[in-house]
Amino acid sequence: MIGDMQKWTPNVASIIEHAKNLYPKQEVISRMISGEIHRTNYEEVCIRSRKLASVLEKDGYKKGDILATLALNTYRHLELYYGISGMGAITHTLNFRLHPEQAVYIINHAEDKIIFVEVPFVPMMEALKDQLSCVEKYIILCDKNELPETSLKNAISYEEYIEEGDENYVWPELEDDAACGLCYTSGTTGNPKGVLYAHKSNILHAYAALTGLTISPDESILMVVPLFHVQAWGIPYYGPMFGLKLVMPGMQMEGEPLYDLIEREDVTLAFGVPTVWMGLLSYCRDNNKILKSVKNTVIGGSALSLAILQEFDEVHDVNVIQGWGMTEMSPLGTSNLMTPEMQKMNKEDRYAMQLKQGRPMFGVELKVVDDSGNELPNDGESQGHLMVRGPWILQRYFKADKDAVDQDGWFDTGDISVIDEDGYMTIKDRAKDVIKSGGEWISSIDLENAAVGHPEVAEACVVGIPHPKWDERPILFIVTNSGEPIEKQSILDFLASKVAKWWLPDEIIFLKDLPHGATGKLQKFELRDEYNNYYMEK
């Protein structure tokens, strides 16, 4: 027997229609390339998304076609999210920080038919266009009078392209599991892998995020996380779904312009990766500024450090919510919300709790297994491979020959983790980054977080390097606040009270910059490759 409820055909365009009907005048704010602040609202975004969809359909693009965006966080990119996917095509968000070879591979692998290009990235596409046989048209995200001279095929400005579109376009009904968006993984040594999201999975993910992050309807959200990065953590969907004010910084992600935008738009909730917040906090510190309106910040992408948590809390009275997920998870899997129990703790214990990745949102299941696949207890001590499953988690990679999950539907995240008796998950390390020294394990993440607590350390990276006696030993790479080396012994003395003696790095190397990937994550494999023989040659 089945239930007697009405059939529902999911289409993410229903979200922007909902926003138009219930929150038509809610603002969508963008800082444009010129620095100008552009203001629109959900009603206008919806109407322009319809116009885009109708023109794409008129041009012969159909359900299942893959259309790419190479764009910044602005209102036009938000329109692309709905206009492309709403008419049944697939929105493929390209990362403009990709190495050219990776960009060529991804575009050709996806078989993108159109690329919507921001003006600053036109030269990048001109350099690659002869290697992209699949692309039929380039639509430049600008007004007609701003269209640059270009050799790109069939180039046209976005505003001219949608000018004759039908603002009364009716969104089509789609198949139950119709594809919606495409994003490729980053930070791997091989070719990136595509993750194909569905309309249904994105809508379910948005519902879960609203509850899992306890977002209130009067929030003004600063969306620093890029729209190209795992669907901006779902904000383009649950923002309009809940009628939230969206504030997008465009290209200017440095501390001063971010602070200016936060103050100007009374931002209450901000989303971003740790490296962005390091820049904002540094600007505030150097200029005696306080984040007056911000109540909460959601941090993900890489592990939250105690130094960032402490400064947000003690200096700015901002609550930090750590979130965890990955491209294969749409991306949100866990969140670490402030609970009444945590509020009663002393500061040291509360910080220790907040540094955990958190508990799974409804719909996500977690477990930790040993090397043989046996489930380990949730005791906060048993480390193992973190496995996940749920309705917005990958089944198989795009165009892959086989599933990426085991026979019971569990996906191996590649993380080494523990889960405690209350369900809080803590990532100890990536399986490929954990350091095995003398038969014991050293967490590179824990060592990095300890190092950035030093007042003169801006950023730290730890990698395990082959050692003739101990199998592997850590090297600590440091970027200082001044950019100049400091006394290594001061670092070791500081760490000695934070970690076990045998965890202390055998070598500390000062660098001007650490290698980051296209989404801001540390590229440890670059340092591992460069210094692989360091201990063997000594």
Please provide the spans of the model-predicted regions.
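Conserved AMP-binding/adenylate-forming core of the ANL superfamily
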Residues: 28-74, 78-82, 99-104, 157-160
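Conserved beta-loop-beta connector loops within the AMP-binding
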Residues: 360-387, 421-422, 484-488, 523
